[in-house]
Amino acid sequence: MKYTSYFLALLLCVLLGFSGSYGQGQFFREIENLKEYFNASNPDVAKGGPLFSEILKNWKDESDKKIIQSQIVSFYFKLFENLKDNQIIQRSMDIIKQNMFQKFLNGSSEKLEDFKKLIQIPVDDLQTQRKAINELIKVMNDLSPKSNLRKRKRSQNLFRGRRASM
């Protein structure tokens, strides 16, 4: 993998921002360990521009930003999974993953397991593709705003109630 990917992956962790002075200090030390290990401070890392920070600038709305952040966090989990056998940087990756888990998934183990399941789904498997297409309508319905539907049902119920009482 290119060093640029590693450096920018670490940059996202910084962008997510972590609270707590002790935890934050340790977090930054672990990032520095990874930067040193991957030689991420080398000037050639900047070649081609950043991976994520420019994309994040384009998304202002908080709920929209969460969508992009989920894709970026997914990248980091895949990156860390790819490097899981590297004992030299394992501790640093574990601390960073824990911080991401707390910040992005609010410390929910169930959400983490679901998130891991999603990023492990192979997109080049025919059976997976068939299942995904089969579920597409339900997924699209879940993506649709529900507030308008609720308002419409509520106003219909109010209208029916008035008609019955007249």
From Swiss-Prot:
Subcellular location: Secreted
Modified residues (Pyrrolidone carboxylic acid): 24
Glycosylation sites: 39, 106
SUPFAM superfamilies: 4-helical cytokines
Keywords, in A-Z order: Antiviral defense, Cytokine, Glycoprotein, Growth regulation, Pyrrolidone carboxylic acid, Secreted, Signal
Tissue spec. comment: Released primarily from activated T lymphocytes.
Record's keyword annotation contains Glycoprotein: yes
Cited Gene3D superfamilies: 1.20.1250.10
Subunit structure of this chain's protein: Homodimer. Interacts with IFNGR1 (via extracellular domain); this interaction promotes IFNGR1 dimerization.
Family membership: Belongs to the type II (or gamma) interferon family.
Protein's recorded name: Interferon gamma
Gene: IFNG
